[in-house]
């Protein structure tokens, strides 16, 4: 990077070796489009290592559940719950133009903040603290000065040998038709509230950014995650939060079963704490417990100033609730990457679930079929007469597309025409699924091709990906 050896103080900490970039917005609203504060799609141009980069961003719709709420407590102990409008939010997912393997998870609220993958390398980006300037810093996590070099670990130590052997990847076919939907409540304890000096807006922004990353990570597992609520214990803890992760997890699960689950519709709850948990532990969750009133929970320590790392820890603990184990040596999520389910939190780019996690998650779902994640959260409680062309997928509809552009379904009913199997996708050809074994995504480098499975229009990820 141009500023090697120099140091700068950013929100994520002191950063050595960074590059100053000036992202330039290059998109314009389509003619006649309604102006939103944050557009549905945006593009930015800047340079990384002298190479021009075009970052394409799409608003992460569905990030918040339909009944999303925020709760805090008054000094006299009263619970105060609001339902803010969050449709026009500023959290995006994206990719780099001309880099098929690229990804991005970006907050565009005040400049660009988040991370993106470019040419196999993961970079962080955030605005520099310079008034009246568009300057941003781009850097790698390895260049953030570490306060604590000790290994940080998940506290789950279950004996995995008690599990039955799982299916081979070739026997497990998961398609978008199997999609599951998980609504999550994030509970912030009083130590977190104190750590952020009682700034609830800052805490919520921190959680929004993490939720954006979590949602992107779970896309690979065909699980759609959304935030059902954020609850901040602003006056005092409602359970005994201890340095023992095990005791805190048990208390939190019991509180959820007797309190939270009766007032907020959700599938899973995670406690975020600034309490320094015993030893190297920074997270703990029950295993294979999704939908259980007491056990569909986890506890995570807010252990890093880098949002991405805390987000991945949350994603890790939630995955335990979904029956996913720690990765072993044979598990892979791409060459050179440390996968999300590593038992040790690695400062490398941890953003992807491994092939093992994919199989274990769906092996658990297929066997146990946890019921709470079957229902797709609707954006309203109203079930209206099915009509095409709106954004809401209403009861009885197969698709929500512009009928004039798609001959595969009936515009009057929004149901597939007789004989049509699909409307679009790499494995859909004139309304019919392509044959099983047809290549739908070519391999990059030493990776493997992805193939159509004959039962979906989408291109499923090859479970044997390197």
UniProtKB/Swiss-Prot annotation:
UniProt EC number: 3.4.24.-
Binding site for Zn(2+): 316, 320, 326
Span of the annotated motif Cell attachment site: 444-446
Keyword Transcription regulation on entry: no
Protein name: Zinc metalloproteinase/disintegrin
Signal peptide: 1-6
Protein localization: Secreted
A single GO cellular-component term on record: plasma membrane
Matches recorded under Pfam families: Disintegrin, Pep_M12B_propep, Reprolysin
């Amino acid at each position: 990077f141009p500023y090697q050896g120099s140091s700068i103080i950013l929100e994520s900490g002191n950063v050595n070796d960074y590059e100053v970039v000036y992202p330039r917005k290059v998109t314009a609203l389509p003619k006649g489009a309604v102006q939103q504060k944050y557009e549905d799609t945006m593009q930015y141009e800047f340079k990384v290592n002298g190479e021009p980069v075009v970052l394409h961003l799409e608003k992460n719709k569905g990030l918040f559940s339909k009944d999303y709420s925020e709760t805090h407590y008054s000094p006299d102990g009263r619970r105060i719950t609001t339902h803010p409008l969050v449709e026009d939010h500023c959290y995006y997912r994206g990719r780099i133009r001309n880099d098929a393997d690229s990804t991005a998870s970006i907050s565009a609220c005040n400049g660009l903040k988040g991370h993106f993958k470019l040419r196999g390398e993961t970079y962080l980006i955030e605005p520099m603290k310079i008034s009246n300037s568009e300057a941003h810093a781009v850097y790698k996590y390895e260049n953030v000065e570490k306060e604590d070099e000790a290994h940080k670990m998940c506290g789950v130590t279950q004996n995995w040998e008690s599990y039955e052997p799982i299916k081979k990847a070739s026997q497990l076919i998961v398609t978008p038709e199997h999609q599951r939907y998980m609504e999550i409540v994030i509970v912030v304890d009083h130590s977190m509230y104190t750590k952020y000096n009682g700034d609830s807006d800052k805490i919520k922004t921190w959680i929004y950014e993490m939720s954006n990353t979590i949602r992107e990570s779970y896309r690979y597992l065909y699980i759609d995650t959304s935030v059902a609520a954020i609850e901040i214990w602003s006056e005092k803890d409602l359970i005994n939060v201890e340095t023992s992760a095990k005791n805190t997890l048990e208390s939190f699960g019991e509180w959820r079963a007797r309190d939270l689950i009766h007032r907020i519709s959700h599938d899973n709850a995670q406690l975020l704490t600034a309490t320094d948990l015993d030893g190297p532990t920074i997270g703990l969750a029950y295993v294979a417990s999704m939908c259980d009133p007491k056990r569909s929970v986890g506890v995570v320590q807010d252990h890093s100033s880098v949002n991405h790392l805390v987000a991945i820890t949350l994603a890790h603990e939630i995955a335990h609730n979904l029956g996913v184990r720690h990765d072993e040596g044979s598990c892979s999520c791409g060459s050179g990457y440390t996968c999300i389910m590593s038992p040790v939190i690695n400062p490398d780019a941890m953003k992807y679930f491994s092939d093992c996690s994919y199989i274990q998650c769906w092996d658990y779902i297929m066997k146990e079929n946890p019921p709470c994640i079957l229902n797709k959260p609707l954006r309203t409680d109203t079930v209206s007469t099915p009509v095409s062309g709106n954004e809401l997928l209403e009861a009885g509809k197969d698709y929500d597309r512009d009928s004039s552009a798609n001959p595969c379904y009936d515009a009057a009913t929004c149901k597939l025409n007789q004989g049509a199997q699909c409307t679009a996708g790499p494995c859909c050809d004139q309304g019919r699924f392509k044959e099983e074994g047809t290549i739908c995504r070519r391999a990059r480098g030493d990776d493997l091709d992805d193939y159509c499975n004959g039962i979906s229009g989408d291109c499923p990820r090859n479970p044997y990906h390197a």
